[in-house]
Design a protein with these regions (language model features):
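Short cytosolic helices in intracellular loops of multi-pass membrane proteins
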Residues: 218-221
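ABC ATP-binding cassette signature C-motif
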Residues: 1-216
Length: 221
């Protein structure tokens, strides 16, 4: 168990009048299953890219884990998933990868087929299996339910509930409710952390919005 510490994070795109983040500070445990919430265009993808070191920023992000993004780009789609795993982790243990696929209700035979021939749902399961056997990793999981039917979403939810250490971005609120135990939410140019799932966060937000509305009404009188 360790902490990911974000201190005074400030970032804005060149030419933009407003910063995406302004002195954002918070910490999260590397064992948490975090849902990342915010309206489209508010900075979710930007923050993931900052964790991945893709942009320069002011402030600090300190962590003892390696951030891994899903879905990661496969350089040669004609490679098999087994070859993809070997290129990333030359010394990985085959039984561990097979175990992950079984937990996702996926045929381990997928490992021997060209990646380009797999369905999008099969690709999702293969890539997640590879990432979750990497040592000392904290996953940044971006919309994993795309291309999955209801049954596969349920299987994936149960799978992720058994894991620790990730940030999950998903527009599927029921999926978030099932999986996460903490919420990261973007509030203007800051990020706040709360224990609970999406419903817990929404209830708290509704209370805060109602309180703010009442205060504004009092000021008008």
């Amino acid at each position: 168990m360790s902490l990911i510490q974000v201190s005074n994070l400030t970032f804005g795109y060149e030419g933009s009048f407003d910063n995406v983040f302004e002195n954002a500070s918070f910490s999260m445990d590397t064992n948490w299953r975090c849902g990342f919430i915010g309206r489209n265009g508010r900075g979710k993808t930007t923050f993931l890219n900052l964790l991945l070191g893709k942009y320069a920023y002011s402030g600090t992000i300190s962590a003892s884990v390696n951030f891994e993004y899903f879905p990661f780009e496969v350089e040669n789609p004609d490679d098999t998933p087994l070859e993809i795993a070997e290129s990333i982790m030359p010394d990985f243990e085959m039984w561990r990868l097979t175990r992950e696929l079984n937990l996702l209700d996926a045929d381990p035979g997928l490992l021997y087929r060209p990646y380009s021939t797999l369905s999008y749902g099969e690709r999702t399961k293969v890539l997640l299996s590879i990432l979750f056997i990497r040592e000392n990793s904290f996953l940044l999981i971006d919309e994993p339910t795309n291309h999955l039917d209801i049954e596969a979403r349920g299987t994936l939810a149960q799978y992720l509930k058994s894991k620790k250490g990730f940030i999950l971005v998903s527009h599927d609120r029921a999926f978030l409710d099932e999986v996460i135990d903490h919420v990261l939410s973007i509030n203007r140019a800051d990020i706040t952390v709360m224990r609970g799932n999406f419903t817990t966060w929404q209830q708290e937000k509704d209370r805060e919005d109602q309180f703010e509305l009442q205060q504004n009404e009092k000021l008008k009188k």
